[in-house]
From Swiss-Prot:
Gene3D superfamilies per UniProt: YVTN repeat-like/Quinoprotein amine dehydrogenase
Name this polypeptide is given: Serine-threonine kinase receptor-associated protein
WD repeats mapped onto the chain: 12-56, 57-96, 98-137, 141-179, 180-212, 221-262, 263-302
Domain of life: Eukaryota
Native source organism of the sequence: Gallus gallus
Amino acid sequence: MAMRQTPLTCSGHTRPVVDLAFSGVTPYGYFLISACKDGKPMLRQGDTGDWIGTFLGHKGAVWGATLNKDATKAATAAADFTAKVWDAVSGDELITLAHKHIVKSVDFTQDSNYLLTGGQDKLLRIYDLSKPEAEPDVVSGHTSGIKKALWSSDDKQILSADDKTVRLWDRSTMTEVKALNVAMSVSSMEYVPEGQILVITYGKTIAFHSAETLEQIKSFEAPATINSASLHPEKECLVAGGEDFKLYKYDYNTGEELESYKGHFGPIHCVRFSPDGELYASGSEDGTLRLWQTTVGKTYGLWKCVVPEEENAEAAKARTTLPGTAEEEIEEVASENSDSVYSSTPEVKA
C-alpha cells in the first residue's frame, strides 16, 4: 500500500515564497532558485535543498527568479523596478536593468545571451546581455500588468500572460500571433519543451494548451483555487497547489486525482518539477520551500527507504545520512496503512 509523503523543508526565507525555478542537469547536479517577498533570492542544491547562497542587492520584494540551463547565471525580477543578472557560481551581481515599474518575470534564452522581462508597465523587454547599456527591444500589446513571460524552446516565439489573456508573439517581427482569453485571472504559466505544452492555471482550472497555437489540449478542475501547476517532464502526472494549503497530484492522461496532502501552513504560490522528474518543489505563504518525492519510498537525495525484515513495522528504525559530515540519525515513522517504512526528513537550515 502507498506510503505517505514526507517533504524536505527548506527554511531561511522570512516572507512568502512566490516563485521558484530549477536549472537543467549539470555535471554538478541541478539547482533550485527561489524568489521571496523578503527581497533575498536563494540558491540551493536541487535534490537535497541544501542552501548554497543568497543573492543580495534588491531593495524590494523579489517576484520572479530563474536560472539558465547550466546554472552559471541567475536572473531576478523585483518590486524595486529592476531586474538583475547574477553570477550563480560566485553570487556576484553582474547587471542591473532599470524598469519603470515593478518587474514580475524573467527568462533566459537557451544560449543565455538574452533576457526577457515583463511586469506592471504592461511591456515585454528583450535585453542583449552582451550590451546591457543598450536600449532593449520592447514589445507592447498587453492591457494589464504582465505576470509571466517565457521564451519558446527555440527562442523564436514568446509566451506571456497578463490578467485574463495569454499572448503568443513572433520574436523576429515583434508582433502578436495569437491571443487566448480565459475566464479568470491567470495565476501561473509553465512552458514544457517536451511536446510544446503550455500549462496555465486560473481559478480552479488547470489547462493545457499547445504552445505553438494556444489551442487547448485538455483541462482539469481542482477542488480549490489553484495558484500554480507543473507537468512531469515525461508527462506522466502533474502537481498543483493553491489556496487550501494542499498539493494535488493528478494522472495527466486520465485526470484522476492520485494524491492530495497538506504540508505547508499557508497558501501555496508555486510548484515545479525537477528536471529529472524525481521530485517537485513548492513555495508557500508560510515562507518555506518543500521538496516532495514523485515516487514515494524511492531512495533519492536525502530520502532513504528501508523495508523492515520483520512484520512489525512499528519497531523498525532506519538511518538517513546527510551530505558531508552532517550526519543525523532521525526517527523512522511507519505508514499508517503499510508495513513499509519511510524516513522523516530533517529541516535544512539556510
